[in-house]
Amino acid sequence: MKTIHDIRRSNARKLRDGVGGNSSFATMIDREPTQTSRFMGDGATKNIGDSMARHIEKCFDLPVGWLDQEHQTTNITKKPDVSITNKQITLVPVISWVQAGAWKEVGYSEVDLSTAETYPCPVPCGEMTYILRVIGDSMIDEYRPGDMIFVDPEVPACHGDDVIALMHDTGETTFKRLIEDGTQRYLKALNPNWPEPYIKINGNCSIIGTVIFSGKPRRYKIKA
């Protein structure tokens, strides 16, 4: 059974990842990164006490006691303010690339939110937003394997947006940049060494989501 300290540490880590890492989190709560690492790093040596828990909640504009509870849904009753721009945060789930292909149709019915890995999205997003971990190297150097991309299916894609597309012939999802040139539209791989960097859109695919934010976990390892 998880202890209160386990729950607090897990929630703090999600907030940390949502704002871009330990340094940003430390700035948010007006502490040194070395101090925050001691209570939520991989080798944490301290627990998050009551006063620190309440301090973190206050800095993120969260209800008192939020850090003490496990959160099994994608919604936070009171969305935290994590920047001076007052952007809202919603917890969203990490899903597979296969699930992404049918997400608009099945959505959360395909994900057990009680066990799903969820993270706060630092920018305003729709209720259907999800997270994918980048695989492959077609979008290097801007995106690397293991990077987390937050995808909102409800945001219309425009020229220059990075998008998730469903290929009709294979049923597979792909991650590329949308290029519009006059009346023509293309999917572009950002890797300059990619053998076929452009895919012409001619009814062969559907754009099913727009990337609205990305993050780079520093300790994530690709599973073999």
From Swiss-Prot:
One of its GO terms (cellular component) is protein-DNA complex. SUPFAM superfamilies: LexA/Signal peptidase. This is Prophage repressor CohE. GO terms for molecular function: DNA-binding transcription repressor activity; sequence-specific DNA binding. Transmembrane segments: none annotated. This protein is part of the e14 prophage present on the genomes of E.coli K12 MG1655 and W3110. GO terms for biological process: negative regulation of DNA-templated transcription; SOS response. The gene is cohE. Keywords: DNA-binding, Repressor, Transcription, Transcription regulation.
